[in-house]
Amino acid sequence: MSMTEVKISEERKYDIVRAPVITEKATLIGEHGQVIFRVPLDATKPEIKAAVEGLFKVKVKAVNTLRSKGKVKRFRGTVGKRSDTKKAIVTLAEGHSIDVTTGI
């Protein structure tokens, strides 16, 4: 199954790739040519692929996404809800890599 090519503006590319996820799990899968990014809830897989390829000048093999529901938390008797989040696990083609410790 191939993803269709999507044309997105330069500004939208920076909106889609919000931040890399720097965790122990993210660094472990980084050794296998995968990178994790926080993305907006409305971002699609083809948009994420186009944004990563455009910003980092790499070839993307696959994009997997996951949505996390925000937890309900109490603070001083007030009930609040954390925001829902979406992450994208981007698999890079052989020979390509992204150093997430440097800025774009």
Swiss-Prot record:
It comes from the Bacteria. Pfam families: Ribosomal_L23 (PF00276). One of the early assembly proteins it binds 23S rRNA. One of the proteins that surrounds the polypeptide exit tunnel on the outside of the ribosome. Forms the main docking site for trigger factor binding to the ribosome. One of its GO terms (molecular function) is rRNA binding. Belongs to the universal ribosomal protein uL23 family. GO terms for biological process: translation. The gene is rplW. InterPro entries: Nucleotide-bd_a/b_plait_sf, Ribosomal_uL23-like, Ribosomal_uL23/eL15/eS24_sf, Ribosomal_uL23_CS. The keyword Nucleotidyltransferase does not apply. GO terms for cellular component: ribonucleoprotein complex; ribosome. Part of the 50S ribosomal subunit. Contacts protein L29, and trigger factor when it is bound to the ribosome. This is Large ribosomal subunit protein uL23.
